[in-house]
Amino acid sequence: MQRRELLPLLGSVALTGLAQPAPQVTSSVMLWTLKGSFEDKLETAAKAGLQSVELVGEYSAWTDADIERVKKLARSLRLGMDTISATPNWKRDPISMVDPAQRSNLLQEVEKNLTFARKLEIPMALLMSGDAIEGKSYAEQWASLVEGCKRCGDVAAKAGITLIVEPLNTKVNHKGYFLDSCVAGLKLMKEVDHPNIRLLFDIYHEQVQLGDVIRTIQAAAPYVKVFHIADNPGRNDPGTGEMNYNNIYRAIKKLNYSGYITMEYLPLGDPVASLTKAVDAMRAAMSA
């Protein structure tokens, strides 16, 4: 082989040896934490430099014309919309995954809300376990939860949507909720083993319930599509409580995570300034 033929090969070898850039996360905000109209909330998110937003049940009464208007507004603000709720009325309606008697209502509710997700071009939908049921053993409810997730996953697969299951703390915010930690959430992911069922890791809820956040993140990372962010106590801005978010973000970076990091806290001051600071701090920690 002559020298001029060898040089391109050497160049390609050298390039493959270079460190690859770290996967990029997408910043988002849960809209219920902001004040004002839906349009006001989108503008707040855009002004703070966020890339996307997460909805809860705002869309429940929207017409097709409303949906097109919202999509146009989000595009004009350069905002994505990443998640809605598959069961926005889970506290009010009998749609718990831990009760087999409610399975039909659950599946109908999920299918209905995934229709909104498709129209809004949103790739994920939040799925709640529901509250524990009096008179049924933990094992019975767990088996129902696993089966419910699988059935919901099949509905989601037909719609081309990923469902993300969220554990919530029962110590402070959601007494009686069944799936109360991401440790249990990881066990659920392994047992369900469905490509359309993944985990939402709310760092605030996990800190309140069990602590040991970084180790649990490391174990659960392959299943996580979204992280929710808030400090403890108070569920306020990162940096106002006991949690070292710089270390948490660095741990997430080491896992080559490339999903969403969503601010779900109650801003103590001006929301634009607060969210700007929070996202800048997250980016700085993950680029260090």
Show where each model-derived region lies.
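Histidine-acidic metal/acid-base catalytic patches
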Residues: Q2-L15, Q20-T26, M30, L34-G49, ...
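Short amphipathic alpha-helices and their capping/turn segments at secondary-structure boundaries
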Residues: T63-R78, E109-K119, V146-A157, I214-A219, ...
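Glycine-rich, proline-tolerant flexible connector loops at the mouths of alpha/beta enzymes
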Residues: L55-R75, S129-I133, N173
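Catalytic domains of carbohydrate-active enzymes, especially glycoside hydrolases
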Residues: K41-E58, E121
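Active-site-proximal loop/turn and secondary-structure-junction residues that shape catalytic pockets
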Residues: T33-K35, Y59, T87-W90, D131-I133, ...
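Active-site acidic/histidine proton-transfer and metal-coordination neighborhood
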Residues: L10-G11, L15-L18, P23, D93-R198, ...
